[in-house]
């Protein structure tokens, strides 16, 4: 292969890959429909809130050593406010209140199990196992 072909290949790999990454949404708060449900409450409540979503730049090493850890950054909460919602028709003795985080700002950092779903594939945020009710203006 001629040297000019290597140059062109290198040029296109480095020129177009970063350009395409600008098309991805950066990590930021977005409005999303989420659902909450609880044992002892027959209905699932769906409502709009702010969650963290978007792309974080990461580097995957070509050689993975069994002696080194790989830490991938994910889009997660930086600043949150907590709000409480009341589930309808809960059985007597069941606390109908559920507290959830509202994203005020987001960052690319390690996944924190306290505030984020750190699984590879998870359910959609509006998934319900019981009958769903919507709150339109919350």
Swiss-Prot record:
Subcellular location, principal: secreted
Any one GO biological process: positive regulation of gene expression
InterPro entries: Cystine-knot_cytokine, Glyco_hormone_CN, Gonadotropin_bsu, Gonadotropin_bsu_CS
Pfam families, sorted: Cys_knot (PF00007)
Positions of disulphide bridges: 27-75, 41-90, 44-128, 52-106, 56-108, 111-118
Single GO MF descriptor: protein heterodimerization activity
Position of the signal peptide: 1-21
This protein's UniProt keywords: Disulfide bond, Glycoprotein, Hormone, Secreted, Signal
Database matches in CDD domains: GHB_like (cd00069)
Sugar attachment sites: 31
Family listed: Belongs to the glycoprotein hormones subunit beta family.
Assembly, per entry: Heterodimer of an alpha and a beta chain.
Protein name stated in the entry: Gonadotropin subunit beta-2
Organism encoding this protein: Clarias gariepinus (North African catfish)
This protein's encoding gene: cgbb
């Amino acid at each position: 292969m001629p040297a000019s072909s290597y140059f062109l290949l290198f040029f296109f790999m480095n020129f177009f890959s970063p350009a395409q990454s600008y098309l991805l949404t950066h990590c930021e708060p977005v409005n999303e429909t989420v659902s909450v449900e609880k044992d002892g409450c027959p209905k699932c409540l769906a409502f709009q809130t702010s969650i963290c979503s978007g792309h974080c730049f990461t580097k995957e090493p070509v050689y993975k050593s069994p002696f080194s850890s790989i830490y991938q950054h994910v889009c997660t909460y930086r600043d949150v406010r907590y709000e409480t919602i009341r589930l309808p028709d809960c059985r007597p003795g069941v606390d109908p209140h559920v507290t959830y985080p509202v994203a005020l700002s987001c960052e690319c950092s390690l996944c924190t199990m306290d505030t984020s779903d750190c699984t590879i594939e998870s359910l959609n945020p509006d998934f319900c196992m019981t009958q769903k009710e919507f709150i339109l203006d919350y």
